[in-house]
A protein has these predicted regions:
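Transmembrane alpha-helices and adjacent helix-loop boundaries
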Residues: 1-192, 196, 202
Length: 203
């Protein structure tokens, strides 16, 4: 019982922390991805914003288009290999750090699109009205657009949290002991997986 309680706590803590960090990542990416530019803007600004949008698009497509278990393997095992040990996750604290990083950046990729969609769903007339009274883009975003956009995407934040609770089960591949991994280990210790016997206690 104590083992299950401890691992359920690990699962919930990982899901909460990673969801919060992922929301911050998604919020930043969503805002940066919707910064407007026109032909009248300096070429450097237009180039920088186009490059930024391209990098965000690559990030979103890669982490939304690949399984989380593959991302976990690459970050936990691949980064130490490719950096010749400069980046390494050692001990339980390292495993926790890797798990949080994996789930956070995965969540951030999904939240980036949710935030972008929430921002562009706001009536453009509100942005034009804010500019007409002399508000800067930053003031318009923080005072007019974001409060409405965040309210619209609150259900998606809840959905991502629920998904993260379930997806933490793939973190066993890097040694993270959450509820699913502990349950599987206990079943292997105390039950027989024989197709004939079913899951029966070992004699």
């Amino acid at each position: 019982g104590d083992v299950y309680k401890r691992q359920i706590r690990n699962t919930l803590v990982l899901a909460v922390v990673a969801t919060l960090i992922g929301c911050v990542i998604g919020l930043l990416c969503g805002i940066l991805n919707t910064i407007p530019y026109t032909r009248q803007d300096p070429p450097v600004k237009r180039f920088f914003l186009k490059l930024l949008r391209a990098l965000i698009r690559i990030y979103v497509e890669v982490f939304r288009g690949t399984p989380m278990v593959l991302q976990a393997v690459f970050i936990f095992y691949g980064l130490p290999y490719f950096t010749d040990g400069a980046v390494a996750f050692r001990g339980m604290s390292g495993i926790w750090a890797a798990a949080i990083i994996v789930v956070s950046i995965n969540t951030g990729a999904y939240m980036a699109e949710s935030v972008r969609g929430g921002i562009i769903s706001i009536d453009p007339g509100q942005t034009e009205g804010a500019k007409a009274i002399g508000m800067t883009h930053f003031q318009t975003m923080t005072s007019v657009i974001l409060p409405q956009a965040i309210r619209n995407i609150l259900p998606q934040i809840g959905n991502n949290y629920i998904i993260n609770v379930k997806d933490t089960s793939v973190m066993f591949i890097i040694g993270f002991t959450e509820f699913f991994a502990s349950h599987r280990y206990i079943c292997l210790l105390y039950t027989s997986p024989s197709p004939r016997d079913g899951l029966l206690p070992r004699m």
